[in-house]
């Protein structure tokens, strides 16, 4: 289950110190509804799951139901999943937390590596363009907010993880190039995001 599908409607989203929507904040998630749905699923009930429409900025219900069997495992993904404030109603001893991060292993030369943040930005640009209706310029514009969100909402909780998984692949930038290059070329040269 993607926690992003529990985003509050965009108009109800919190704002940062600059007045911009703060999509990285925990209270951008409808935590109460998320917990109600997760408790119901773990109790074996049939639950209609939301789907967040990133283009409209609204949570929608489209008849996507889920019911867990006695032996099923519930997998939840999202930036706040290591934070127990997200899943306050779920017993800690029933959780196995995995911290997944893309830790790039590529070097430019013998002394300089490809920064992990660069690989994550390319991943995010491709994802946002394919699934969220966002341009590369939009993603780059939001990147500082995303990085602040990592510092506030991910890194402080990484020690809470029961396991760590590196999701980077040596060849992934080569694969992503065919998707990233066209959207990067669409960034206007005279825009702040071009530099």
Language model region names:
Residues 54-62, 145-148:
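Short gly/ser/thr-rich secondary-structure transition/capping motifs
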Residues 1-5:
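Phosphate-binding active sites in nucleotide-utilizing proteins
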Residues 68-70, 92-93:
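Short loop/turn elements that form and flank the Walker-type P-loop nucleotide-binding site
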Residues 73-77, 99:
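Structural recognition of the conserved hydrophobic beta-strand(s) that form the central parallel beta-sheet
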Residues 81, 85-195:
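Conserved NTP phosphate-binding and transfer environment spanning the P-loop NTPase/kinase superfamily
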Residues 8, 12-58, 73:
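Conserved nucleotide-sensing/catalytic segment adjacent to the nucleotide-binding pocket
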Residues 10-15, 63, 87, 110-112:
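Short acidic, glycine/serine/threonine-rich loops at helix termini
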């Amino acid at each position: 289950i993607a926690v992003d599908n529990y985003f509050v409607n965009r108009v109800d989203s919190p704002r940062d110190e600059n007045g911009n929507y703060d999509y990285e904040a925990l209270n951008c998630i409808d935590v109460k509804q998320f917990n109600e749905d997760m408790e119901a699923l773990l109790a074996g009930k049939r639950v209609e799951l939301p789907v967040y429409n990133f283009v409209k900025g609204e949570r929608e219900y489209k008849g996507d139901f889920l019911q867990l069997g006695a032996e099923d495992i519930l997998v939840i993904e999202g930036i706040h999943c290591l934070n127990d404030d997200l899943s306050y109603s779920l017993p800690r001893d029933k959780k196995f937390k995995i911290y997944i991060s893309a830790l790039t292993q590529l070097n430019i030369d013998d002394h300089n590596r490809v920064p992990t943040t660069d690989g994550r930005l390319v991943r995010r640009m491709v994802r946002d363009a394919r699934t969220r209706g966002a341009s590369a310029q939009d993603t780059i514009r939001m990147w500082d907010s995303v990085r602040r969100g990592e510092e506030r909402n991910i890194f402080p909780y990484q020690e809470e993880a029961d396991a760590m998984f590196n999701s980077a692949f040596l060849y992934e930038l080569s694969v992503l190039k065919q998707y990233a290059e066209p959207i990067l070329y669409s960034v206007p040269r005279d825009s702040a995001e071009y530099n």
